[in-house]
Design a protein with these regions (language model features):
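Short active-site neighborhood of thiol/selenol oxidoreductases, capturing the structured segment around
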Residues: 19-52, 61-65
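Structural microenvironment flanking redox-active thiols in thiol-disulfide oxidoreductases
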Residues: 44-97
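N-terminal "domain-start" segment that seeds a small globular fold
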Residues: 1-25
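Short loop/turn microsegments at loop-to-beta-strand junctions
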Residues: 5-6, 31, 135-137
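Thiol/selenol-based redox catalytic cores and closely related redox-interacting motifs
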Residues: 89-158
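A structure-centric feature marking long, well-folded core domains of fungal metabolic enzymes
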Residues: 9-11, 29-30, 56
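A short, polar/charged loop-to-alpha-helix boundary motif
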Residues: 156-175
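Cysteine/selenocysteine-centered motifs that mediate thiol-based redox chemistry or coordinate metal-sulfur cofactors
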Residues: 175-208
Length: 208
């Protein structure tokens, strides 16, 4: 923590070329939640929770990241607007940059995940149970992309349950920061990158 995500541009289902640092501006902290692909049962479950409880999201902002293209999400939602940004990262550049983990089999399961998959299967969803599954990542981000808090999920459902939980995480982080000594100086880049440019940003290798 204390380091910064470099500046980049991202696409949402309805608007391309958004500035990440512009998203980070303002007095309210930004909570970023990394999810699997948009059509994944876990993603659908938690996005539904966040939409239903969005009115409780006071004093904090939310952005969800999905491993799908903006076009795919736009087609699935028929161009509908979300009340919070959906950052589309089909190649998984942000996931790799931030070290979002994957796990196979029972290592990624929870009782909540079993329930979600059971319901999805009853609705016709098919999946490869042996394939690695993306584990969620929760960040609280401040000005200039400074990472204030990070939690790597230990299971597919180890993430904030709803917007009340998101609000409480942000409040706890801001209260802790206000009570403690000044954190390390933000390290950031003045260059605006695209998502693919993030690969190798920190080690100088931009040929990957």
């Amino acid at each position: 923590m204390g380091t910064s995500i470099p500046r980049f541009t991202f696409d949402t289902p309805t608007k391309p070329g958004n500035d990440f640092y512009a998203l980070c501006e303002g007095e309210q902290p930004l909570v970023m939640i990394f999810l699997p692909a948009f059509d994944h049962p876990v993603t659908r479950e938690y996005l539904t929770h966040y939409l239903k409880t969005y009115a409780r999201l006071r004093g904090v902002r939310l952005a969800c990241v999905v491993r799908s293209s903006a076009r795919t999400v736009a087609q699935a939602t028929q161009g509908a607007e979300f009340p919070f940004p959906i950052i589309c990262d089909a190649p998984g550049v942000l996931y790799s940059y931030l070290g979002v983990e994957q796990a196979r089999g029972l290592r990624s399961w929870s009782f909540a995940a079993q329930r979600i998959y059971k319901t999805a299967k009853e609705q016709g969803y098919r999946y490869d149970s042996s394939a690695p599954q993306i584990l969620p990542l929760t960040l609280v981000v401040g000005h200039l992309g400074k990472i204030l808090f990070i939690h790597s999920g230990r299971s597919q459902t180890d993430l904030p349950e709803d917007c009340t939980a998101i609000r409480e995480i942000a409040r706890e982080v801001t209260s802790t920061l206000a009570a403690g000594p000044e954190g390390p100086r933000t390290r950031c880049s003045d260059e605006t990158l695209t998502l693919p440019d993030l690969v190798g940003w920190d080690d100088g290798d931009n040929d990957r």
